[in-house]
Regions:
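Short, surface-exposed terminal/edge motifs of secreted or surface/virion proteins that either
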Residues: 78-81, 116-132, 169-201, 233-236, ...
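Small/polar beta-strand repeat architecture
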Residues: 4-8, 130, 186, 190-218, ...
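Short loop/turn segments that connect beta-strands within the blades of beta-propeller domains
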Residues: 75-77, 106, 113-115, 183, ...
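N-terminal beta-propeller domains
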Residues: 1-86, 141-149, 297-374, 455-469
Length: 632
């Protein structure tokens, strides 16, 4: 009898030296971990615990923070600014309302919405973006004038000029003597040098209002309301948006096209009545004033703001309009003079509310949950809006938007996305999608090529918050203990707020990096590997497992094993009392089909390698059935 040759299962030894990251899916391998806290890929291919953080100062009631030449924190109603150059801290009390803020930088100023104020990092001042003046108990005078705000008093009115005029004499030449003050008349001035009459253009209105000149500047766009000019027959369209062309000591000069039967006159409007007087003072009229005169430089209500090409762009979840301020001027949002520096506004046709705004690759981007709107161009005349139906920013996740290495990362209803200028791609396939959905808040930050994402699914509920870290260079996810209800990236540092204090993610990057005050002494960590033993179909068992660990400081490690999905059994522990030491932890597990490994402890460790000794088995590790019935 001849027996067939059968390949013998040999003993083998494998060494795992390249470790992955967090994988919450079914396909979690032995080089990854299915659950864990406070590990990072900073020493890849080894697996190390994160760096200790440093507590900078106690901080409560934080409504937002932003970095621009220093760190600005909005605490309750107060603004606190700490310059990077070590200058004196600036505090502005009762500067804003006690509510969550949307912050954006432009030049040296940090704009704060919805309060519509600006904090100047250069001088520490706070100023309002908008302005409003009301004639409460005051009289306002309206008079036609030239571009420089000058008014004129004619010495005569008629169809023909006087025969012997004096040099500089003013005359009003009319077309209809029954309506001498109508707008189609011509105001002229005589020049003795040339012997000719020259027409004076009165295409502007001088508004004399005490205190108004202090609130507005030249080239501001001001909304004028409540005037009796139309009822007086002086201007048809004075009420509305007007450009301020000149500002004097007590008046403003705005553009207003001549109109009406009583154009050539002065209108003085009081609380409940207005009086019109002709330019030569020969005729007066009384008109009822139903409203109070108001001058306002408007700023739209914006929920999401971003800066792109020296303009602040914004949108609101309550309307389908995208706004851009005047070039370099965040105080003017409705300036339409037909020049390249004009403001800009466009209505979009997509359904749903806006959920976020950001700037990336030179584009101003506006998101809805299922749409991306991209604006490109250099001036209003060539701005172009393109729309893409894709996975956009999830509701309540506007602050998850973060640009890192020329790529925009954000939380969508389907997971974490990356946009590099084309189509968003999902980068969170290894994470549990159900734990990324229906968030109450999401905040993003960046440091050293790592994207930090804080997620809160149920406000105020313990255990429903996570701090996920994505290594964008290696495509690995990790999770850290929650210390980031709010974040602010500086490019070289990441500041985190845990609800009670402000922390620095990397203490070595602080100006006083030598100080150890506030630095975490012990970092708690935990790691659960994927199933070990799924990489081969032969009947072999794990006879020996050796862990190679490095301790960067005094640390403790507890090792536990779970056989075939059973309970955890502690099999080894390690106490490292010296820094910069390497340790080998040999483990001899009992026979099993699959095995999971758990590391738990405090300190700073690095998992360098994992060595597996596999031995041949005689069967029985995995249930075998000789007969199987297949149904198609």
């Amino acid at each position: 009898m001849v027996l067939a040759n059968r390949t013998r299962v040999q003993n083998s030894r494998t060494l795992l030296r390249a470790f992955g990251g967090l994988n919450e899916g079914y396909g979690c391998s032995e080089a990854e971990y299915s659950a864990g806290i406070n590990f990072s890929s900073r020493d890849f291919p080894a697996l190390s615990t994160r760096k200790p953080r440093r507590k900078l100062r106690t901080l409560t009631g934080l409504n937002g923070m932003y970095h621009l030449n220093g760190l600005l924190t909005v605490c309750g109603k107060d603004l606190v600014y700490t310059p990077d150059d070590g200058g004196e801290t600036v505090t502005c009390t009762d500067a804003v309302a006690d509510s969550k803020k949307a912050l954006v930088g432009l030049g040296t100023k940090i704009l704060i919405f919805p309060d519509k104020v600006a904090f100047d990092t250069a001088d520490g001042s706070v100023s309002a973006l908008g302005a409003c003046w009301k004639a409460e108990g005051q009289s306002v005078e309206f008079a036609p004038c030239d571009a420089e705000g000058r008014t004129y008093t004619p010495t005569g009115v008629g169809r023909e000029e006087p025969e012997s005029p004096a040099d500089g004499q003013i005359f009003l030449k009319v077309e209809d003597e029954e309506h001498p003050w109508r707008y189609d008349g011509t105001l002229e001035v005589y020049s003795a040098a040339s012997g000719n009459w020259t027409a004076l253009s009165l295409d502007y209105c001088r508004i004399t209002a005490a205190g108004a000149q202090e609130k507005f500047c030249q080239w501001d766009t001001v909304t004028v309301q409540g005037t009796a000019a139309k009822q007086a027959g002086q201007w048809e369209a004075l009420d509305g948006d007007c450009v301020v062309y000149a500002v004097t000591e007590n008046s403003l000069c705005v553009r207003a096209d001549p109109a009406g039967d009583y154009f050539y006159g002065t209108l003085v409007q009081g609380t409940d009545a207005a009086q019109w007087t002709s330019l030569d003072g020969s005729q007066t009229r009384s008109i009822a004033a139903e409203q109070t005169v108001q001058l306002e430089r408007r700023v739209p209500d914006l929920d999401f703001v971003t800066e792109c090409d020296n303009r602040v762009w914004g949108c609101s979840s309550r309307e389908n309009v995208i706004y851009a301020c005047k070039l370099g001027d965040p105080t003017n949002w409705f300036s339409y003079r037909g020049i390249a520096a004009d403001s800009y506004a466009v209505t979009v046709g997509s359904d749903g509310a806006f959920t976020g705004a950001a700037t990336c690759m030179g584009y101003a981007l506006f998101f809805k949950e299922n749409t991306l709107h991209k604006l490109c161009g250099t001036k209003p005349s060539d701005f172009q809006l393109t729309s893409l139906r894709c996975r956009g920013v999830a509701k309540n996740a506007a602050r998850s938007l973060c640009v890192l290495n020329e790529t925009l990362y954000y939380l969508s209803p389907d997971g974490v996305m990356a946009w590099d200028g084309s189509i968003p791609t999902k980068v969170s396939a290894v994470l549990d999608a159900s734990r990324l959905a229906n968030v109450q808040s999401a905040v993003g930050g960046a440091l050293d090529g790592r994207y930090y994402l804080h997620i809160s699914r149920t406000a105020g509920t313990q255990g429903q918050t996570r701090l996920l870290v994505y290594d964008t260079e290696r495509g690995l996810w990790h999770e850290e203990d929650v210390c980031s209800c709010d974040m602010a990236s500086t490019g070289g540092q990441l500041y985190l707020w845990d609800g009670q204090a402000l922390w620095a993610a990397d203490p070595s990057r602080e100006s006083d990096w030598q100080s150890t005050e506030g630095v975490e002494q012990q970092v708690s960590f935990e790691l659960v590997t994927g199933d070990i033993g799924q990489d081969g179909a032969e009947q072999r068992y794990l006879s020996r497992l050796t862990l190679r660990l490095d301790a960067a400081c005094a640390s403790t490690v507890e090792v536990a094993l779970s056989y075939d999905g059973g309970p955890w059994e502690t099999v080894a522990s390690l106490t490292a009392r010296e820094a910069r030491r390497s340790y080998d932890l040999p483990l001899v597990p009992r026979r099993h089909s699959t095995l999971r490994l758990r590391l738990r402890g405090k300190g700073q460790i690095t998992l360098r390698s994992l060595a597996k000794n596999l031995a041949a088995a005689k069967g029985g590790l995995v249930e075998e059935r000789e007969e199987a019935t297949w149904q198609v």
